Regions:
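ATP/NTP phosphate-donor binding region
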Residues: 1-94
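Short C-terminal domain-edge/linker segments immediately following a structured domain
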Residues: 70-75, 98-101, 149-156
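A glycine/threonine-rich phosphate-anchoring loop and its flanking beta-alpha core
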Residues: 16, 113-170
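Glycine-rich nucleotide phosphate-binding loop and flanking beta-alpha elements
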Residues: 26, 48, 103-105, 126, ...
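Structural motif
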Residues: 40-42, 97-99, 159
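A short, small-residue-rich loop immediately preceding and capping a beta-strand
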Residues: 88-111, 115-126
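Short glycine-/acidic-enriched loop or helix-start segments at secondary-structure transitions
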Residues: 51-53, 107-109, 130-132
Length: 170
């Protein structure tokens, strides 16, 4: 085995905490409470609309605040990552919560890496591995692949709410 492959195998990043099941989004406050007090929630428009009420309920008892709910921009592009990172820093958020499909989750992870903040992912579809991996696939704003952004860490938390995923259109 080559030395570079051996080095890669000695460091195996994995999400800090994974919660799954019906109603799992209710644990958002518990997961985020140890990481910060002010959440920046970003995601797809539909994903945010369908989870907003549950997100508020999930953080209510934990005494956390939401700095913003923001659309991720439609593509995991450098432009969207930079714009969202600037907003995160101006809001003084200390935890990123990314909600939606692969591109939304990848954008959230990239924003977290740029801002050096923990990221909790909430996948709303079961089609990708974006919720758990230390990788963001990037595109330009036309949706054309531009590359892979390899991150140092996986999300610190992953919430797989099966009631949300089961309600996803086929």
């Amino acid at each position: 085995m080559s030395e570079s492959i051996n080095k890669q195998l000695t460091r195996l990043p994995f999400p800090g905490k994974i919660v799954r099941g019906t109603g799992a989004l209710a644990s958002l406050g518990e997961i985020c409470r140890t990481q910060g007090k002010k959440l920046y929630v970003l995601g797809g428009k539909t994903a945010l609309a369908k989870t907003k009420q549950s997100i508020y309920a999930g953080i209510a008892q934990a005494g956390l605040d939401i700095a913003a709910f923001a659309w991720y921009g439609g593509e995991c592009s450098q432009e969207n990552i930079d714009k969202l990172a600037e907003d995160v820093l101006s809001c003084q958020a200390d935890v990123i919560v990314a909600v939606g499909g692969g591109k939304a989750l990848d954008t959230g992870k990239a924003v977290g890496a740029k801002c050096n903040l923990p990221v909790v992912t909430v996948p709303t579809i079961a089609a990708t591995c974006a919720a758990v991996t230390p990788l963001s696939v990037t595109y330009n704003n036309k949706g054309e692949f531009t590359g892979n952004l390899f991150l140092d860490d996986c999300p610190t938390g992953v919430i797989v709410d099966t009631s949300i995923i089961l309600a996803t259109p086929v």
